[in-house]
Amino acid sequence: MTTPLSGAHGDEPDDGRATRPDAQTPARARRWVLPVIAVAATLVVVAAIAVVGIVAGDAGPTATPTATPSVTPNATASPDALSFERPADWDPARPGFHLTPEAHWINDPQRPFFAGGLWHLYYLYNADYPNGNGTEWYHATSSDLVTWHNEGVAIEKYRNGLGDILTGSAVVDTTGSAGFGAGAVVALVTQQDDGVQRQSLFYSTDDGYTFAEYDGNPVMDNPGVVDWRDPKVIRDEAHDRWVMVLAEGARLGFYTSPDLRSWTYVSDFVRDDLGLLECPDLFEMIDPESGRRTWILAASADGAASGRTTGFAYWTGTWDGERFTADDTDPLWLDDGADFYAAVTWDDPRRTGDDRLTERSALAWMNNWAYARDLPADQWQGGALSTTRTIVLDEVDGRLRLRSRPADGVRGLEGAVQSAPAHVVEPGAIAPLAVQPATSSYRMRVSFDRPESGEVRLRLADNGDSSVTVGFDSEAGVAFVTRADDDAADRMPDAYRTVRTSAQPTGDIVSFDVLVDAGSVEVFLGDGSSLTMAIHPGDSPHVTVESTSAPVQVRSLWIAPMAIIDPND
């Protein structure tokens, strides 16, 4: 992705090594102006008890779809090692369990890999913001994909005359094909200098903590196009070579290599109705239920033409080693919220055979370039990375789709659960929720019978004047999140106030699994769809519930505090 405040630095590089038959500028539906500021918010949500109980003690939602298996909450006290108290010196907008830098700018995550017994993640970081240009790769590690520890800058900007370090991908070269030794971590990244984007290689022999520059950079020189970035590299075992997908304006270019250093163009995939494509992905998966296999091509794209915002668009199809053929021209979308961008997915190399292809993990940057500079921020800027989610394939009406649920490791952050008996929410009145979260960072799961008419609304941080609403519209058949009434809405562009919806056309039971943190809400629906939103509510300790038209039978409701994770501790 092009980054905020990327400028011209360094000398012009030597010719690169990519071979490509054309050098025309691809059609560009949109040129992004990439602003810089953080998504930040203060969210303290506490509810009072008030609804009539009928059946006590249900610990989780009744409906359990294929992609969202039941999670039995931890009913005992949380482990001593977990803390649920926010540090006194934290900005109120600092997320409690989402990854942020200690200060300065954050955006695109880079696909994690497993090495040395840990997961390694990088994200784009600008320590010079707002007064200086360019991003570099900041390193974080985790044992569970949920609790992250910041390790420091791993690939520095402006050190080789080719500009700053933009998005790319790192792979573990298990055979040493690149010539840096078996097990070396090889990163292919975009560098931008004076507006020209090229691909460079850096390598690490200490599991990704430090990187050396390849002396043949750039390994891919720009063939004369404006947008030519975000290399996503995978190992194509069936064809015994490396494959790269590169974002090239309105198209995705495919390249192959035997050694990660010499790349040859082989084909492309063009879409002129999704704006500027960024942060591509390519991977194979298997539906564990039907056994169907598919390849998935994805990119961060602009869905405005279909009434959406930017997000992670994907296509299922086939890959023959050189060309991707989509099953359908229309893309699917992994998340229906406004703030799930620059997403990355990955599998677990410790799993083998077909088992490795049955599920992947994913996370994204929780922000949107339409208003990133308008969100309030103090200690750092750019927002946060999302919670890691598990994604699986699910066949619906003969078409394979990706479904999401929070990663299993999220449960390890939960504290003592509070649950409510089953109860009925009567129409018309706005009432306090039946149980209250103990902290501003919490997980809430609720399931209720689909009402005959009207809406069910859960208002987070409801002080009577401002709130963020998670709800279900029975007549439209959609779940929704709206922040049109939060504390930042009046000074935000229209894109921020737009209601975001996720279609839920069938089913008698509606299930929400909601992760709430300062600055964000992630809603996972019973069918495996999701809505991720940056929010800026007020500091009211109140959550209310309302049914606008018909009585609603709540089957289960529970809330657990989430541990506070300091990635800089």
Show where each model-derived region lies:
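N-terminal compositionally biased, intrinsically disordered segments and leader/signal-like regions
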Residues: 3-4, 20, 26, 43, ...
